[in-house]
Each structure stands twice: as structure tokens, then as C-alpha cells.
């Protein structure tokens, strides 16, 4: 049984936010790098970078906090498609999270995309997670 690196990334960021820990270190894979870039581009995290220790690569993510409140921008995240149960959607049926305030991250034939990008390119794929 393999590790689910997407769930590790999402859970690590969510747990770090709950205990107000600023940075998270997870194993770097192509999928986690792409999801990290999407979260950075959409403004849910402040920074993401790759770090190497010996032969292992890690992804270090820094949480983004609101100014006066000690709350993060990424309030909730939910893993949708799991290794035991894959969930697919065409571009017309991609759900909207909180009326468009959150994002859906999809794995498509053109890479890891947000729901807006997938609708614009008119391609569907596997729904990986919701973030809001």
C-alpha cells in the first residue's frame, strides 16, 4: 500500500494552520509541487519552495495569515478523489466551491488545473480536492 502524497500535503497544511505553525515540510513529488504552485498562485499560501536533504526532496510551504487575525487564508480543505475511489467529472459538471470563492483542484490530461482553468479549456478530469 502506497502513500497518498496529496492527502499528506493537505492534512499537513491544515494541521499546521490549526496549531499556528508557519511552515510545513512534505515529500516533494510532481503532483505536490503542482498543487503547491496552484495554492501559491491562488493566494492560499505565502511561499512554497523545494529543499533537498541528501537524496530526498521536500516541499516547504509557508502559511499566509491575515493581518490582525491569527487565521489563515486557507480555512478548509477536503480530499475528494482517493486511491480507492476515484471521482471524475467533465468540464460542465465541475462543482463550484462556495459560489466560486474556493477552488477545485483537478488532474487533467493537460496537468494539474483549477476548476476555472479546466472550464476555460473545456476539459474534465479527476477531482483531487476542494480548498476554501
From Swiss-Prot:
Keywords: Chloroplast, Plastid, Ribonucleoprotein, Ribosomal protein, RNA-binding, rRNA-binding. GO terms for molecular function: rRNA binding; structural constituent of ribosome. GO terms for biological process: translation. Its main location: plastid. It is found in: Plastid, Chloroplast. One of its GO terms (cellular component) is ribonucleoprotein complex. Belongs to the universal ribosomal protein uS8 family. NCBIfam families: PRK00136.1. Part of the 30S ribosomal subunit. One of the primary rRNA binding proteins, it binds directly to 16S rRNA central domain where it helps coordinate assembly of the platform of the 30S subunit. This is Small ribosomal subunit protein uS8c. The gene is rps8.
Amino acid at each position: 500500500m502506497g502513500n497518498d502524497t496529496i492527502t499528506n500535503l493537505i492534512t499537513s497544511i491544515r494541521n499546521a494552520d490549526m496549531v499556528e505553525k508557519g511552515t510545513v515540510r512534505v515529500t516533494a513529488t510532481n503532483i505536490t509541487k503542482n498543487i503547491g504552485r496552484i495554492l501559491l498562485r491562488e493566494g492560499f499560501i505565502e511561499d512554497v519552495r523545494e529543499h533537498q536533504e541528501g537524496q530526498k526532496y521536500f516541499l516547504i510551504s509557508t502559511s499566509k495569515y491575515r493581518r490582525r487575525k491569527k487565521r489563515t487564508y486557507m480555512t478548509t480543505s477536503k480530499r475528494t478523489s482517493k486511491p480507492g475511489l476515484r471521482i471524475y467529472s467533465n468540464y460542465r459538471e465541475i462543482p463550484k466551491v462556495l459560489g466560486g470563492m474556493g477552488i477545485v483542484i483537478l488532474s487533467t490530461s493537460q496537468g494539474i488545473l483549477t476548476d476555472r482553468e479546466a472550464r476555460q479549456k473545456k476539459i474534465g478530469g479527476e477531482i483531487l480536492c476542494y480548498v476554501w
